[in-house]
Regions:
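A short, basic/flexible loop-to-alpha-helix module at the beginning of a structural domain
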Residues: 1-9
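Extracellular/periplasmic catalytic domains that process cell-envelope and extracellular macromolecules
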Residues: 6, 103-104
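N-terminal Rossmann-like FAD-binding beta1-loop-alpha1 element of flavoenzymes
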Residues: 12-37
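Short, glycine-/Ser/Thr-/acidic-enriched flexible segments
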Residues: 20, 42-43, 110, 116-117
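Glycine-rich FAD pyrophosphate-binding loop
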Residues: 29-51
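Acidic, Ser/Thr-rich peripheral helices and adjacent loops at domain boundaries
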Residues: 50-64
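Conserved redox-cofactor binding core of oxidoreductases
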Residues: 61, 66-82, 89-98, 103, ...
Length: 230
């Protein structure tokens, strides 16, 4: 094994470019620090024609649409698996724990449903409400300013509903309900069930000049070439 000396000097070295490492990189670099970001997987850009799988037909896959053992199919844009060779994590015998291991720029931010809900006051102090578990040493009010910053940074659509344990945030307009959803909403409200739009980190309007807006292709799992999802 060859060890290559690098003359560059950095203030911080961050291992992993996923949700934690990526956000730490942004915050520290915005503060003026020089960052070295180390990632086990390859560079990835969902708008790169050589990597993009969005809006492609099954016969355009490497296997021309035939079956694959790759988790979630050939067009799923998250390089990794439930188990990765060399992974150091272990579990007890006769137990099961499935956790997606993503090896690429962005890590598991390329593999999630973009559901962006806040923990509410009850979630931080559950023992006070049901006697189970332990309370967090912090409250929702302690975390609220950071939720607010994140909403504005990544863009989350939703509606303000004033539900105590589903705190409102800074929302973009939600998509209009489709016909079958209108039927669900009508039936639920007739039964006295509260129905609200989901809260997802998908842009329904522009928040900056580097990311586009969702065009409703329904292929978020293929990664967005318009950069409309986070």
């Amino acid at each position: 094994m060859e060890i290559i000396n690098n003359s560059q000097k950095y203030d911080v070295i961050i291992v992993g470019s996923g949700a934690g490492g990526g956000m730490a990189t942004k915050v520290l670099s915005d503060a003026g620090l020089k960052i070295a970001l180390i990632e086990a997987g390859p560079y990835f850009d969902p708008a790169n024609p050589d990597q993009m799988t969005q809006m492609k037909w099954p016969w355009e896959s490497p296997r021309r649409g035939s079956g694959t053992t790759r988790a979630f199919g050939d067009f799923h844009m998250s390089y990794g698996d439930w188990k990765v060779e060399g992974e150091p994590y272990t579990i007890e015998k006769e137990t099961s724990f499935r956790w997606w291991r993503s090896r690429m720029l962005g890590g598991r931010t390329n593999h999630w449903g973009r559901i962006s809900l806040r923990f509410g006051p009850k979630d931080f102090k559950s023992k006070d409400y049901d006697g189970l578990g332990e309370n967090w040493p912090i409250s929702y009010d302690d975390i609220k300013p950071y939720y607010n910053k994140l909403d504005k940074l990544i863009g989350v659509f939703g509606t303000k509903e004033n539900i105590f344990n589903e705190p409102d945030g800074f929302f973009l307009p939600p998509p209009k309900p489709r016909l079958h959803e209108l039927f669900y909403i009508k039936g639920a409200r007739k039964s006295g069930v509260t129905v609200i739009p989901s809260r997802l980190s998908i842009l329904t309007k522009r928040i900056n000049n580097t990311r586009g807006v969702c065009f409703y292709c329904g292929q978020c799992d293929r990664s967005c070439s318009a950069y409309a999802d986070f």
